[in-house]
Design a protein with these regions (language model features):
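Glycine/threonine-rich flexible loop motifs
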Residues: 32-49, 181
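Short glycine-/acidic-enriched loop or helix-start segments at secondary-structure transitions
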Residues: 12, 32-35, 79-81, 180
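Amide-donor transfer/coupling interface in amidating biosynthetic enzymes
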Residues: 1-20, 24, 49-64, 91-199
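Short glycine-rich anion-binding loops that position phosphate/pyrophosphate groups of nucleotides
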Residues: 27-30
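Ubiquitous "structural anchor" signal
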Residues: 34-35, 44, 62, 82, ...
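Class I SAM-dependent methyltransferase SAM-binding "motif I" and its flanking Rossmann-like core
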Residues: 88
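Catalytic nucleophile loop
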Residues: 22-23, 59-85
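Short, well-structured alpha-helical patches and their helix-loop capping segments
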Residues: 46-53, 70, 78, 82, ...
């Protein structure tokens, strides 16, 4: 089910009673104030209402021990929710970074390599190396507490994470744009379903 954005925390609690897990999708930049920084000029559109809503859903899911799968913005918002921070603009803040923002006309085309920790849950699904699409200009700077980086690009930018308890996992790319052509990515969604079915 799609959960509508709301500023009413009690509604978030009602929504969470109806689901066994969360998928947090892509979207706008996260307001830098949530990780203690002022915005740089390259920050794009932000939506504080959506930020607060996502943080509340994450808080409730963690409290209720329900699984969470984050995609792109979802990857970043999970890191911030766990106390981490972000590079607000990789091209201007990370010297030597590769291109992480490909043409939007090629959403189903893998453009860079991600090296995975084969011992991690996501590594067991995706293998040691995987090529992914990429549509982001922000990325993890300081890792949130209780999270582990399990996949990165050659420039060191994190691309996949898991929580220590295994209930949270996220990727910086967009597997929903890839799985028709590259079925291995369906395994990420299967993992969420499998974890949710145990609740």
């Amino acid at each position: 089910m799609l959960i509508p954005v709301t500023e009413d925390p009690s509604r978030c609690a009602e929504y969470m009673e109806l689901v066994d897990g969360l998928l947090i999708p892509g979207g706008e930049d996260i307001a830098p104030e949530y990780y203690g920084e002022d915005p740089v000029p390259q920050v794009n559109y932000i939506n504080r209402e959506k930020d607060r809503y996502d943080f509340e859903l994450i808080r409730l899911a963690r409290e209720q021990k329900k699984p969470i799968f984050g995609i792109c913005r979802g990857f970043q918002v999970l890191n911030v929710a766990f106390g981490g921070s972000l590079y607000q603009d990789i091209p201007s803040q990370v010297p030597g970074a590769i291109c992480h923002s490909q043409s939007l006309d090629l959403r189903n085309v893998p453009t860079h390599k991600v090296t995975m920790d084969e011992t991690s849950a996501l590594g067991r699904i995706l293998g040691k190396e995987i090529y992914t699409n990429s549509y982001h200009h922000q990325g993890i700077k300081k890792l949130g507490e209780g999270l582990q980086i399990v996949g990165s690009t050659n420039d060191g930018i994190p691309e996949a994470l898991e929580s220590e308890d295994g209930l949270v996992f996220a990727v910086q790319w967009h597997p929903e744009e890839l799985y028709n052509d590259y079925p291995v990515f369906k395994g990420l969604f299967t993992r969420l379903i499998d974890l949710a079915s145990q609740k």
